[in-house]
Swiss-Prot record:
It holds the Pfam family Methyltransf_5. One of its GO terms (molecular function) is rRNA (cytosine-N4-)-methyltransferase activity. The lineage of its organism: Bacteria, Pseudomonadati, Bacteroidota, Bacteroidia, Bacteroidales. It comes from Parabacteroides distasonis (strain ATCC 8503 / DSM 20701 / CIP 104284 / JCM 5825 / NCTC 11152). This is Ribosomal RNA small subunit methyltransferase H. Keywords: Cytoplasm, Methyltransferase, rRNA processing, S-adenosyl-L-methionine, Transferase. It is an enzyme of class 2 (transferase). Its EC number is 2.1.1.199.
């Protein structure tokens, strides 16, 4: 099981995450990004017989990694429904700590049939939940030029978003874009030799975020933590790109996504959280060397007041 999980996804900043949760043996914890179960298994090692852990994941593949442990409950769902499920289990307002590792797992990147990586040819899919929702191919073939440009600009931060969208719309008039190979062939003129990987990463990130409605889902999950965590409960979040990190940073600091500071009568900043680490935590050089995919990770820890 351990070997299989290490292939599925290597837990990023594992030690720092566990320290951030400040685990109590009899506590109630939630891993909203279960994936390969690496973080969850380490949390279980630190829980006593009365402790409880809930793991969320919308991907059916993650169920193969569920530990046979009576203290663990697997929730096959998008983490945007965190509050609904924790209320169902009678744990709303009782949770001692919540972990969210927002990165795409190695399992997804390395499975050519899932369509997350430009390294392989395969179906242009990118759905985390393969049973529902539109695929990346659906978006590329059906969105208007304006809608496509918005996706590439807002989620990929691409300056050539309008030109890129226009080329895609024109290309699909001749032939439907169904595979990663089809897609790469169309956008080839935009990929400069020096920054090809960076450009493609931005394009694929934009499509993935749109396919899975990631930014809205993240906002809903973060709002839910206000009702799920008990006072003193810890929120530990690992981000991988500037869009999600900005949301998390603002939310933990101010309680909203715009970063607007609200003050009380005495001029003190009002926030539902107290920052545990004022400075963002990043992987050590040793971890990055061991796991290059951790390079862009940022860890933030806060405590509900």
């Amino acid at each position: 099981m351990e070997e299989k999980d290490s292939c599925y996804h290597v837990p990023v900043m594992l030690r720092e995450s566990l320290e951030g949760l400040d685990i109590r043996p009899d506590g109630i914890y939630v891993d909203v990004t279960f994936g390969g179960g690496g973080h969850s298994r380490e949390i279980l090692k630190r829980l006593g017989s009365e402790g409880e852990l809930y793991g969320f994941d919308q991907d059916a593949d993650a169920e193969h990694n569920v530990p046979a442990d009576p203290r663990f409950t697997f929730v096959r769902s998008n983490f945007r429904y965190l509050y609904n499920f924790m209320r169902y289990y009678g744990e709303s307002g009782e949770v001692d700590g919540l972990l969210a590792d927002l990165g795409v797992s190695s399992h997804h990147f390395d499975d050519k049939d899932r369509g997350f990586s430009f390294r392989f040819d395969g179906t242009l899919d990118m759905r985390m939940n393969t049973r529902a929702g539109q695929t990346a191919a659906d978006i590329v073939n059906n969105y208007t030029a304006e809608a496509l440009a918005d996706v590439f600009y807002l989620y990929g931060e691409l300056k050539v978003s309008r030109k890129l969208a226009s080329v895609l719309v024109k290309a699909r008039e001749t032939k439907k874009i169904e595979t990663i190979g089809d897609f790469l062939e169309v956008i080839k003129p935009f990929t400069g030799k020096d920054k090809e990987k960076k450009f493609l990463a931005q394009v694929f990130q934009a499509l993935r975020i749109e396919v899975n409605d990631e930014m809205r889902a993240l906002k809903e999950m973060l709002r839910s933590t206000l009702r799920v965590l008990r006072p003193g409960g810890r929120l530990v979040v690992i981000t991988y790109h500037s869009l999600e990190d900005r949301l998390v940073k603002n939310f933990l600091k101010t309680g909203n996504f715009e970063g607007k500071c609200e003050q009380d009568f005495f001029g003190n900043v009002r926030s539902p959280f107290r920052l545990v680490n004022n400075k963002v935590i990043v992987p050590t050089d040793e971890e990055v060397e061991r796991n290059p995919r951790s390079r862009s990770a940022k860890l933030r820890i806060a405590e509900k007041v």
